[in-house]
């Protein structure tokens, strides 16, 4: 193991992502075509976060990940008055506190567009993310296998944002 990272997970996460203990990653000190790998060690700690759901300890200003677990949550956050105002405040805090705000939405494009207000919520979400400069990752989840894959993806995102900020 050549490097160690600590991922901080908000204590209010109801169904937290599952992070691996180790990751084999592309060595950032070598050119990518060399395909040199390094192993990094990950530790996860739970702590109440004021903004977002996941950060890399010591790199809070580089990247913050906010996770939304369902279309229903996004629909409420984007289309319904009080929830929308709260969601906009979250997006403002993300933009103010980090150079790379990321919203992870669990689900598939088909799920998002199939539900009754789904397509309207998608339009509202895209507009809000554009207005507040937030990146969107749309990834399936729900079962443990997907939460592990999503956890690995988020870990790689947090680490790589830190390496190249």
Whereabouts are the PLM-identified features?
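Conserved catalytic cores of phosphodiester-cleaving nucleases, focusing on short active-site segments
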Residues: 63-69
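Non-catalytic C-terminal interaction segments of nucleic acid-processing enzymes
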Residues: 1-61, 72-165
């Amino acid at each position: 193991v050549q490097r160690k990272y600590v991922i901080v997970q908000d204590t209010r996460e109801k169904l937290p992502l599952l992070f691996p203990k180790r990751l084999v990653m592309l060595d950032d000190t070598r050119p990518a075509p060399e395909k040199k790998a390094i192993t990094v060690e990950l530790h996860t700690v739970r702590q109440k976060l004021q903004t977002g759901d996941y950060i890399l300890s010591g790199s809070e200003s580089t990247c913050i990940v906010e996770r939304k677990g369902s279309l229903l949550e996004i629909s409420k956050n984007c289309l319904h008055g009080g929830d929308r105002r709260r969601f906009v405040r979250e997006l403002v805090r993300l933009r103010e506190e980090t150079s790379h705000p990321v919203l992870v939405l669990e689900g598939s494009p088909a799920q998002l567009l199939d539900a009754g207000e789904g397509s309207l919520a998608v339009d509202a979400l895209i507009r809000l993310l554009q207005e507040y400069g937030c990146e969107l990752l749309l990834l399936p989840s729900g079962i443990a296998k997907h939460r592990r894959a999503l956890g690995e993806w988020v870990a790689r995102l947090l680490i790589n944002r830190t390496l190249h900020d």
